[in-house]
Structure formats: structure tokens, C-alpha cells
Amino acid sequence: MRSDPAAWPKDAADKSIDLRCAIPHWDWEFRHFPHPQTQALARLLAAHGVGLIAGHHAHVVQPVQWVGKTLVAYGLGDFLGTALARQPWPGRIGGIFVVDVSADLGKRGTIAGYRMYPFMRLGAGGHERLVPVEALSGPMKGKVEARLRAIFGD
């Protein structure tokens, strides 16, 4: 899609499109909660027929929510890291976002379910590895779980 909403597709009911998706580069860096302007853009995309939005740019995980019938994952964090040599621990939390889309007759293109698989990027020996949050231990596990509850709720 172009930057100018006036140039966006007008026909949200186009039956040749099963699911319109957007991957916007948006929001402020290193903020866990989307800015009101970002939320407004999500509503605008939803109003233009986008059914799934997976945002990026904040470098940290952000909430997942429904905007009408549109599923919005505001930010998934960093999969491979940033240019920062010593990134603070909250910026090392990321998520793999899996969305199930129906192919059934009559429901084709609708979101049947989703799940976020949170992970922590841990460094060791000059390399980083992705560790599922449930595999963490000690105080770091408690900190990460508390942060995720603050972002996503229980």
C-alpha cells in the first residue's frame, strides 16, 4: 500500500482477495505500547478492508488486539537483534506470531485462530539463540513473564 490513504484500494469487499494483510513499519522504538497515532492507523487500515496487520519497527513486543474483525499485532520485537551492542533485556524479548487462516468454504480467508510464541534472545560465546520463555529459569524468567503479562494481560 502507498503512504497516502487516498491511493489505497477502495473495494474492501473484493471477493478475489481472501485476506488482505498489511505489514506497516510504524510506531516509536522501544515502547511496549502503541502510540495513539499507530492505533488510529490500525483502525484506518481495518476500515480499508485489511484483515491482518503485523507491525514492526518498535524493536520490542507490543500488544495483539482485535480492531473490529481485523487482527492487529502491533510489534513482534526483534528476531535477530538491533544495531545496539548492549541491548537492554526488555528489547531481547520477541515473539513468533502464528495465524491460522480458514480455507473452508464460506469462511475462506477468515482468521480461525492465532498464537504468540514469546522468546528471549540470549547471548553466549558471541552468538545469540532464541529461547522459549517457558524454558527460561531463575529471576530472568520471572522478569520476562511479568513484562509479558503487562503487555498482553493474563
Residue ranges and their predicted role:
Residues 1-154:
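Acidic, metal/ion-coordinating pockets
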